[in-house]
Amino acid sequence: MSAIALGMIIFAYLCGSISSAILICRLAGLPDPRQHGSGNPGATNVLRIGGRSTAAIVLICDVLKGMIPVWLAYQLYVPPFYLGITAIAACLGHIYPIFFQFKGGKGVATAFGAIAAIGWDLTGLMMGTWLLTILLSGYSSLGAIVSALIAPFYVWWFKPEFTFPVAMLCCLVLLRHHDNIQRLWRGQENRLWNKLKKKKEMTEKEKKRTEKEQRKED
């Protein structure tokens, strides 16, 4: 392993360890995503507790954590195998962040960013697969699982030299979703739309309650 490859792997892990969900929630005055919602510090949970705009910012930051290190390693001609290790290091940083007591998210967005750095054609296919699965099923976790299963085949078709590293990365994502896979199998996984609907209903109830209290005071 060259010094450049080793340096990029360390850099990728440190980038991944910056938990954008926790930091952005703090800046926005929102609850800690590790202690609310699903307990997962990721964009989907931030969507539940903070809304679309905050979740979108978290999603972009998580994608960039994987994209930037892998893109830099790609530009520095790091061999495909170590490029894959760089991508895995970024995801491991997101999953086990050194800056946040090694308690992180599931690494889906970061893995997506790492794969996107290899080619924009792969980005479109991955995004399309993820969105289509969510729209058809309503399960955010299923979108991530299906995308992780299909991604190696996309890479094999367009850039076969990166198939093995991407397959390793996707295995890591699937391992992080083992609880979701069990809940899906048992029919216990909650649909994303149902969670958002419940949140909207709770917000409306709180709003009505506040209005009633104000009327009483008047």
From Swiss-Prot:
Coiled coil location: none
Pathway the protein acts in: Lipid metabolism; phospholipid metabolism
UniProt-listed Enzyme Commission number(s): 2.3.1.275
GO BP, sorted A to Z: phospholipid biosynthetic process
GO molecular function, one term: acyl-phosphate glycerol-3-phosphate acyltransferase activity
Membrane topology, record value: Multi-pass membrane protein
Keyword terms: Cell inner membrane, Cell membrane, Lipid biosynthesis, Lipid metabolism, Membrane, Phospholipid biosynthesis, Phospholipid metabolism, Transferase, Transmembrane, Transmembrane helix
Annotated localization: Cell inner membrane
Pfam families per the UniProt record, alphabetical: G3P_acyltransf
Transmembrane segments: 4-24, 54-74, 80-100, 107-127, 130-150
GO cellular component: plasma membrane
Reaction(s) catalysed (UniProt annotation): an acyl phosphate + sn-glycerol 3-phosphate = a 1-acyl-sn-glycero-3-phosphate + phosphate
InterPro entries: G3P_acylTferase_PlsY
Family of this protein: Belongs to the PlsY family.
NCBIfam families: glycerol-3-phosphate 1-O-acyltransferase PlsY
Subunit structure: Probably interacts with PlsX.
Function, in words: Catalyzes the transfer of an acyl group from acyl-phosphate (acyl-PO(4)) to glycerol-3-phosphate (G3P) to form lysophosphatidic acid (LPA). This enzyme utilizes acyl-phosphate as fatty acyl donor, but not acyl-CoA or acyl-ACP.
Protein name: Glycerol-3-phosphate acyltransferase
Gene: plsY
